[in-house]
């Protein structure tokens, strides 16, 4: 359903929920599939996947203060600085570089061994000057990006279709893979009830 995405606000003090806060503040719908939201400096960045847009909103009034357009199918935004952020995509072999101050696309990071049909980058975490990103749909890799050059400098093969990526307090990366689906030309891994992951045996040097 198009324009089905909504934004709600939960107040932990009163334990109440306000629905449709974006629509009520801006008199327009968010669009189709609000995939993720990141807050930075009192601005919320709402990534709307199928509508190819990122809305910047004031988190106190929920009013739009800007938007980034011209994206393929955005998934997540990660801020490198006040003037540079990365936006991951599905159905694209590139990670977009944007300027949050001007809301403009300023460049691209080309991901190796991807096409427009098989391209997929998802969540991002940062350690020092490096950003790590899991490649989800039809992929099985984690990429390492140097933020000073905006280039992929290393990669690690993991299980099929890593869906998420986090870094723990000991600076270790953890990912979850969904294994694809039976009959997929890109591979399939049967689910198991228990897996012991020895992180020290499969390592991507930070």
Question: For each predicted feature, which ranges?
Answer:
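Conserved beta-strand positions in repeat-built beta-propeller and related beta-rich domains
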Residues: 1-3, 45-50, 87-91, 133-137, ...
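A short beta-strand motif characteristic of beta-propeller blades
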Residues: 17-28, 63-68, 104-114, 151-156, ...
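Repeated scaffold domains used in trafficking and secretory/extracellular systems
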Residues: 32-36, 73-78, 118-123, 160-168
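Residue-level detector of Asp-centered blade-edge/turn motifs that repeat once per structural unit
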Residues: 39-41, 80-82, 126-128, 168-170
């Amino acid at each position: 359903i198009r324009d089905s995405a909504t934004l709600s606000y939960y107040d932990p003090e009163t334990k109440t929920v306000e629905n449709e806060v974006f629509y009520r503040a801006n008199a327009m719908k968010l669009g189709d599939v609000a995939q993720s939201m990141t807050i930075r400096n009192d601005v919320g960045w709402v990534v709307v996947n199928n509508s190819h847009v990122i809305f910047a909103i004031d988190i106190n009034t929920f009013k739009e203060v800007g938007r980034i357009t011209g994206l393929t199918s955005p998934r997540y935004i990660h801020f490198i600085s006040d003037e540079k952020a990365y936006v991951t995509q599905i159905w694209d072999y590139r990670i977009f570089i944007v300027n949050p101050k001007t809301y403009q696309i300023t460049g691209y990071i080309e991901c190796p061994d991807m096409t427009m049909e098989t391209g997929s980058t998802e969540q991002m975490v940062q350690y020092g000057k490096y950003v790590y990103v899991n490649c989800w749909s039809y992929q099985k890799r984690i990429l390492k990006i140097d933020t000073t050059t905006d280039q992929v400098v290393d990669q690690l093969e993991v299980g099929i279709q890593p869906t998420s990526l986090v870094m723990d307090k000991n600076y270790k990366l953890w990912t979850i893979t969904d294994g694809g689906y039976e009959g997929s030309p890109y591979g399939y891994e049967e689910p198991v009830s228990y897996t012991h992951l020895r992180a020290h045996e499969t390592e991507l040097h930070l």
